[in-house]
From Swiss-Prot:
Source lineage: Bacteria, Bacillati, Cyanobacteriota, Cyanophyceae, Leptolyngbyales
Organism expressing this protein natively: Leptolyngbya boryana
UniProt entry tagged with the keyword Iron: no
Protein name per the record: Protein HesB
One Pfam family per UniProt: Fe-S_biosyn
Protein family per UniProt: Belongs to the HesB/IscA family.
Length: 121
């Protein structure tokens, strides 16, 4: 299982984690997917105070990464970057498991197991 953070993503995530209330040694980010978006799956990225019992745990630099075990196969090999532009900025996911992505870049399909799509908001 591998989720890779670019240097920009790691720096931004470290800043988020340090800026949250009660920073602890177990605080990290939880990466996963949920049903949704116009292609079927959308990425989730949340601050977590500690891992859940079944989480896959990785660390890159000073950022702990907790991976939802049900999403592990869908996000294995994902590279997370942070991009800044005139029109938008945020975390971008490059997923080798995605068989298709939507035009807005917020959701993806993965083989035969993709749930029904809903329009992007």
């Amino acid at each position: 299982m591998t989720v890779t953070l670019t240097e920009r993503a790691e720096l931004r995530l470290r800043a988020f984690l340090q800026g949250t209330a009660n920073p602890t040694d177990t605080k990290g980010i939880r990466v996963g997917v949920s049903d949704g978006g116009c292609s079927g799956y959308q990425y989730t990225l949340d601050i977590a105070n500690e891992p859940k019992p079944d989480d896959v745990i990785e660390q890159q630099g000073r950022v702990k990464i907790y991976i939802d075990p049900q999403a592990a196969a869908l996000i294995n090999g994902v590279v997370v970057d942070f991009v800044e532009g005139l029109m938008d900025s945020g975390f971008k996911f490059s997923n080798p498991n995605a068989t298709d992505t939507c035009g807005c870049g917020q959701s993806f399909q993965a083989g035969d197991c993709t749930p029904a799509a809903v329009p992007c908001s």
